[in-house]
Amino acid sequence: MSYEKLLERFLTYVKINTRSNPNSTQTPTTQSQVDFALTVLKPEMEAIGLKDVHYLPSNGYLVGTLPATSDRLRHKIGFISHMDTADFNAENITPQIVDYKGGDIELGDSGYILSPKDFPNLNNYHGQTLITTDGKTLLGADDKSGIAEIMTAMEYLASHPEIEHCEIRVGFGPDEEIGIGADKFDVKDFDVDFAYTVDGGPLGELQYETFSAAGLELTFEGRNVHPGTAKNQMINALQLAMDFHSQLPENERPEQTDGYQGFYHLYDLSGTVDQAKSSYIIRDFEEVDFLKRKHLAQDIADNMNEALQSERVKVKLYDQYYNMKKVIEKDMTPINIAKEVMEELDIKPIIEPIRGGTDGSKISFMGIPTPNLFAGGENMHGRFEFVSLQTMEKAVDVILGIVAKD
């Protein structure tokens, strides 16, 4: 179905810079997310007819309710999207609207080209309306496409009270891109039987498996002496960091893994001879494999310290989130409903693991099973990001179908 305000709504949202800040201790981590919630989304939610619209300063979530129009539909269902965008330039976002007929797309005057040679997924969108960047910023379809889709679906239902639907709760939250958005999620306030994050990618994505995730921060303590007299005295902290990294499996890195394969990812390394620091993320799907990865990292550090006869490798290892499959597979109702709706709409469900995490990972373990629905974004987190208007429209259709199911 075509929705008059969907594109306009999306373009309004993406032009607002809501990039999160991993170095901030505030909630949300940027004031722009608060402003977006209070000055843009909250008035709009109230205007389209949502009830009990309220902002929770304790966790940065904006929540609203659309009351049920049917006593027959007993489920209470939530839809969640995040307001922040990823760690890439989000200042002065200038979207392009392209009626795509194939070939390359020039991204404004930036000199960058969105080409099917580099991104074969473009070939799936011939004849569709694409929204791209101008090559200087990201787009923010992750996850403002989700916000626009949820808002459009709620507006449609509020303006068509004759449509039977269950009670619906909507939540727009902060800081998903830096992994802390759902840390303070208020399950009691949201109060639904199950929910969906609308934060996926291409048409048909329906996901209930995520990585289990850990962070690993290492500090290597060296001993700096003059290199001319260093024999048997110098301990080079940078070399220790390299030694640690060399003992991790070489073929278990992000660039060499896919599907259900886990990895170690070194994403930051800095230091001097005297002290060096390295930061990793550890990811895997199965609990036993996840534990093995963490144990290996700890064992390498312990063995290095034993060989050095002192604690020169200091380890901070902490869990970040877990594979929500463990929760959702106990009751597949939200998956079965979404799958049935997609099939009725001639959308092929793509049920594959998320090689990442969503807010739903944490929310599921808090007590609300929360799988992930497609929102349409492609090539997310950078200048080559784009989204199809037609895919966004179908995401709205899916939301409308879900809330009408018993």
Curated annotation (Swiss-Prot):
Name a biological process GO annotation. proteolysis
Q: Which InterPro entries match?
A: ArgE/DapE_CS, Bact_exopeptidase_dim_dom, Peptidase_M20, Peptidase_M20_dimer, Peptidase_M20B
**Main location class:** cytoplasm
Coiled-coil-forming residues are none
EC number(s) reported in the record: 3.4.11.4
Binding residues for Zn(2+) 2, per the UniProt record? D142, E177, H381
Q: Which UniProt keywords apply?
A: Aminopeptidase, Cytoplasm, Hydrolase, Metal-binding, Metalloprotease, Protease, Zinc
Could you tell me which SUPFAM superfamilies the record lists for this protein?
Bacterial exopeptidase dimerisation domain, Zn-dependent exopeptidases
GO CC terms, sorted: cytosol
**Which catalytic residues are annotated?**
D84, E176 (proton acceptor)
- Kindly list the positions annotated as binding Zn(2+) 1: H82, D142, D199
PROSITE patterns, per the entry: ARGE_DAPE_CPG2_1, ARGE_DAPE_CPG2_2
Q: Which compartment or compartments is the protein found in?
A: Cytoplasm
Q: Which cofactor does it need?
A: Zn(2+)
Per the UniProt entry, the signal peptide is none
Cofactor: bound how, per the entry note? Binds 2 Zn(2+) ions per subunit.
Q: Which GO terms describe its molecular function?
A: metallopeptidase activity; tripeptide aminopeptidase activity; zinc ion binding
> Which family does the record assign?
Belongs to the peptidase M20B family.
Q: What does this protein do?
A: Cleaves the N-terminal amino acid of tripeptides.
NCBIfam families given in the database record: peptidase-T (TIGR01882), PRK05469.1 (NF003976), PRK13381.1 (NF009920)
**Protein name, entry field:** Peptidase T
